[in-house]
Amino acid sequence: SDDPEICRDADVIAITAGAKQKPGQSRLELAGATVGIMEKILPKLVEVAPNAIFVLVANPVDVVTYCAKKITGLPENQVFGSGTVLDTARMRYLISLETGTAVQNIHGYIAGEHGDSEVPLWSSTEIGGVPITQWGATLDGGVFDEAKRERIAHDVVRSAYRIIEGKGATNYAVGLAVQRIIGAVLNDEQRVLTVSPLLEDWHGISDVCMAVPTIVGREGAGRRLELPLTADEKERLTASADHLREVARGLGY
């Protein structure tokens, strides 16, 4: 339905409406068309559900979320994007395949843009308390060296492109990721998820929406956790933020 009345007094509204991503097209190339859709539907949704938590899912999710925050004028906790929740899950899964350990015991995050400039935070990734860089032998007899980490990061970034090339769209995995986010809100789980809230002085990064580990509960996006970063991670995240901000400015936001 395209009737906003069905969302009246909703607790959570997940917005997936957006331009369709074509094979070979980056998420950022979708920005103009998708933001145009947001400009039409968001004011109507805010009118019927001013207290709802708005979870943006449409790509490019970080830019769309920033524009949505400006369009709605809602408090920063109420508007955030799905971020890299799915990317983080994919990274942990690939680590589990390399090490033979349960995904539940792997702790690590992907931050930044949900897209080509995203940054795996390897320096804080661990398995059962053991830093990934000190893990030792992997199942193939190798070690978790830089080459292996880069391959995992590449596979995570390319996974959506491969799916789009194969069947034309992504739906199941991102649906599960959004389900996890909505569950964290409705059940007030206070769960750490790499959603995309508005950042203000997060490791010196401000005025941009991008994925960082964030405590998510009934009030939406809460505290943004400032994990220790290496100089390289901070530099790459700053570059990712600059790029996202530039795209938003190009759209008039």
Name the predicted role of every residue range.
Residues 1-9:
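Short acidic low-complexity segments
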Residues 2-3, 82, 111:
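Conserved beta-strand termini and adjacent loop/short-helix elements that scaffold enzyme active sites
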Residues 8, 22, 62-66, 88-90, ...:
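Short, well-ordered, mixed-charge alpha-helical segments that flank or form enzyme active sites
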Residues 11-14:
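N-terminal Rossmann-like NAD(P) cofactor-binding module of classical short-chain dehydrogenase/reductase
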Residues 17-19:
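Conserved NAD(P)H cofactor-binding loop of Rossmann-fold oxidoreductase domains
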Residues 24-28, 226-228:
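Short acidic, glycine/proline-rich loop/turn micro-motifs
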Residues 26-93:
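Rossmann-like NAD(P)(H) cofactor-binding subdomain of soluble oxidoreductases
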Residues 72-78, 87-231, 235-253:
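C-terminal substrate-binding/catalytic lobe of Rossmann-fold NAD(P)-dependent dehydrogenases
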